[in-house]
C-alpha cells in the first residue's frame, strides 16, 4: 500500500505500531531518534512520515523544521504523535509544519485508522 517512516523512541510502542501497520499492508521503516529519522527521510521517499514529538538527538519538531527546509522534501506528509496533548503543543506541531497531530495514548488500531484516513 504505502511506504511509511515511523520515528518513535519507545521501542515497545514502535514495534507494536509497526506490526499493526505492516499487517495493514504498509512498508514500514523505523527510526528510534530524530537523527536516524532525518537520515532516513534524506535517503528515501515516504508516503507518510510519523514522528514522535519527544525523541532523543532531534525532537519531532526539529525534524519537521529541517525537512520543511529541504526543497525536495518540504512537501512530505507528516503526522506528529505526542503525549503532550495541550492545544499549545498541537499548535506548535502545526506551526512547525506537521500536517496532522494525534495525541497519545492511542491504540494501534486508532493510529491505523488515522493513517488510512490521511492516505485516502
Language-model features: locations:
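C-terminal output helix
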Residues: 106-115
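Conserved acidic carboxylate
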Residues: 8
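Charged docking surfaces used in two-component/phosphorelay signaling
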Residues: 15-23
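Acidic, metal-coordinating helix/loop segments flanking the phosphotransfer/catalytic sites
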Residues: 30-48
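Receiver (REC) domain active-site loop signature in two-component systems and cognate sites
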Residues: 55
